[in-house]
């Protein structure tokens, strides 16, 4: 595997300027390197948090950059405070998910069964599409495939980012976290469930059950395009078996031991509803299992990551991840 390596230490760079490296053809953007303590004298731990973007977006989308910039800034401020001595350093990592950003192959395969909005309505009109025609027949398969692919990219980068980023063994990564918005929130749930090295996760308007989320969407797709049957070609048997094997809410208790999770949702989110998407029931189950879960459904909020959510993200990462005290919320 070819890994392109450039100098990882750039102390004169802006804290918000990404250091981009290529890991086996995947551009990876790393924020926070200038804030690291001196490698030769540092005994502090080092946490890396992946921030995963939403469907049809990219690593540069404003919703992601708002999270990235504030998380880097907040961690730096808190670590420099009097009570921050001994806290872990933090790096924030972004990359484009499969079929998104620079990895786009077929944009239509990122669409739902029926996309809303005036822009899409005009596209459908220009293409001569009929009211009953779907934008993307394979939406369910494409959604799960992208989510799982992203979670596996996270595992891949946990393996290969350290040698690419620190070729002279300047630092050792001690902790791995994941934060994700929408599609990235689904992928964060999957990373929590299937990657034991991810110990802290914050899914934002994400679902731990793609099966629950998508079957609800299919059943409620308005006529004349819907409702859709829960069978082929929309839900092939092979896809149903993947839901059984992969959906986080179908995994066993041992997968969640020691995990720290903060679930953020909008009360008026009609795309990934906290209840219809299965988050409420799974959060209850996790709490029954003794897993530390902080869940907040923000009133008067739709499918968005708000400034209030971003502050909760920063606070959770600090208190449950970076802080030398690790006090409970």
What is the predicted function of each stretch?
Residues 95, 179, 204-205, 264, ...:
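Alpha/beta-hydrolase-fold catalytic nucleophile elbow
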Residues 25-110, 274:
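Short, surface-exposed "cap/lid" segments of acyl-processing enzymes
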Residues 108-169:
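Alpha/beta-hydrolase active-site loop
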Residues 271, 276-329:
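C-terminal catalytic histidine-bearing segment of alpha/beta-hydrolase fold enzymes
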Residues 38-43, 200, 210-289:
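The feature captures the conserved acid-bearing segment of alpha/beta-hydrolase catalytic domains
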Residues 1-47, 329:
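A domain-start/cap signature at the N-terminus of enzymes
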Residues 155-223:
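Primarily recognizes the serine-hydrolase "nucleophile elbow" in alpha/beta-hydrolase
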Residues 34-43, 70-89, 162-171, 245-255, ...:
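Alpha-helix termini
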């Amino acid at each position: 595997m070819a890994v392109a390596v450039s100098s990882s230490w750039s102390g004169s760079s802006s804290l918000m300027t990404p250091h981009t490296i290529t890991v086996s053809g995947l551009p990876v953007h790393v924020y926070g390197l200038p804030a690291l303590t001196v490698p030769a004298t540092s005994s502090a731990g080092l946490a890396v948090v992946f921030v995963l973007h939403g469907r049809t977006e990219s690593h540069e989308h404003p919703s992601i950059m708002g999270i990235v910039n504030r998380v880097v800034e907040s961690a730096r401020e808190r670590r420099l405070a009097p009570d921050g001595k001994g806290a872990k350093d933090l790096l924030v990592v972004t990359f484009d998910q499969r079929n998104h950003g620079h990895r786009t192959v077929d944009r239509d395969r990122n669409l739902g069964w029926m996309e809303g909005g005036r822009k899409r309505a005009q596209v459908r009109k220009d293409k001569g599409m009929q009211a009953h025609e779907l934008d993307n027949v394979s939406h369910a398969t494409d959604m799960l495939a992208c989510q799982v692919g992203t979670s596996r990219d996270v595992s891949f980068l946990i393996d290969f980012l350290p040698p690419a980023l620190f070729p002279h063994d300047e630092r050792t990564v001690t902790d791995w976290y994941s934060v994700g918005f929408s599609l990235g929130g689904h992928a964060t749930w999957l990373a929590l469930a299937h990657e034991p090295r991810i110990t802290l996760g914050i899914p934002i308007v994400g679902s731990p059950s793609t099966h629950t989320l998508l079957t609800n969407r299919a059943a409620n797709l308005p006529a004349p395009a819907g409702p859709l049957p829960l069978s082929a070609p929309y839900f092939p048997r092979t896809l149903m078996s993947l839901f059984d094997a992969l959906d986080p809410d179908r995994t066993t208790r041992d997968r969640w031991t020691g995990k720290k999770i903060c679930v953020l949702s909008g009360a008026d989110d009609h795309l990934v509803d906290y209840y219809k998407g299965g988050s409420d029931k799974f959060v209850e189950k996790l709490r029954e299992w003794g897993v530390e879960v902080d869940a907040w459904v923000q009133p008067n909020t739709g499918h968005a990551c708000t400034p209030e959510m971003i502050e909760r993200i920063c606070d959770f990462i600090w208190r449950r991840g970076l802080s030398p005290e690790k006090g409970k919320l």
